[in-house]
């Protein structure tokens, strides 16, 4: 649904290029799918991952640790105060989950496709790099608009094979295979 919404908005608006802003699991692939289908110059700007937290000296992060701590709470090994403290540490800053889940996987593979500023997928959401990345994304959006650099001009089977190789190299989410296949199907 989001990919269709993105596609229709891109087709309906008189724009020369579009900066797609997303972050979590399904937003990035949906936006890219819509952009590929609309075949207008696009560049993705992801929000970046959150920082990890700490609970009783242990490094913790959203997604990876929440189920384990919730099970401990249900087993009454943690009390109400403990689980509140854990919750505050599982999501200590803004950003996508700070693990190699689908959000990080799709940011990295979208960068591998050439649809993002190089070295922008993993900069934390709260870092000063995010502003620099956003500025560079804006610069590139003007360039791709002037060159009318549509996805159909540079995305191909080799692009997606490269993204799959990157996916394997990073040990990314298996959801990445599904999303990359769906994105490639829009060419």
Stretches found by the model and what they are:
Residues 1-162:
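Active-site cavity-forming subdomains of large catalytic enzyme subunits
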Residues 35, 110, 168, 184-185:
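Residue-level preference for well-ordered alpha-helical positions
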Residues 177-187:
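Alpha-helical support elements that line or immediately flank enzyme active sites
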Residues 164-166:
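Flexible, glycine-rich loop/tail regions that form catalytic "lids" or insertion modules at the edges
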């Amino acid at each position: 649904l989001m990919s269709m919404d993105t596609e229709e908005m891109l087709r309906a608006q008189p724009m020369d290029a579009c900066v797609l802003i997303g972050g979590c699991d399904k937003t990035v692939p949906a936006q890219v799918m819509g952009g590929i289908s609309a075949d207008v110059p696009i560049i993705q700007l992801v929000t970046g991952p959150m920082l990890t937290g700490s609970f009783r000296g242990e490094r913790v992060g959203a997604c990876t640790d929440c189920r384990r701590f919730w099970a401990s709470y249900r087993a009454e090994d943690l009390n109400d105060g403990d689980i509140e403290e854990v919750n505050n540490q599982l999501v200590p800053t803004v950003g996508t989950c700070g693990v190699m889940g689908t959000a990080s996987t799709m940011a990295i593979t979208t960068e591998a496709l050439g649809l993002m500023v190089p070295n922008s997928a993993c900069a934390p959401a709260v870092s000063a790099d995010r502003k620099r990345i956003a500025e560079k994304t804006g610069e590139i959006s003007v360039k791709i608009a002037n060159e009318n650099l549509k996805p159909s001009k540079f995305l191909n089977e080799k692009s997606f094979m490269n993204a799959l190789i990157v996916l394997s190299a990073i040990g990314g989410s298996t959801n990445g295979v599904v999303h990359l296949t769906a994105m490639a199907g829009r060419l």
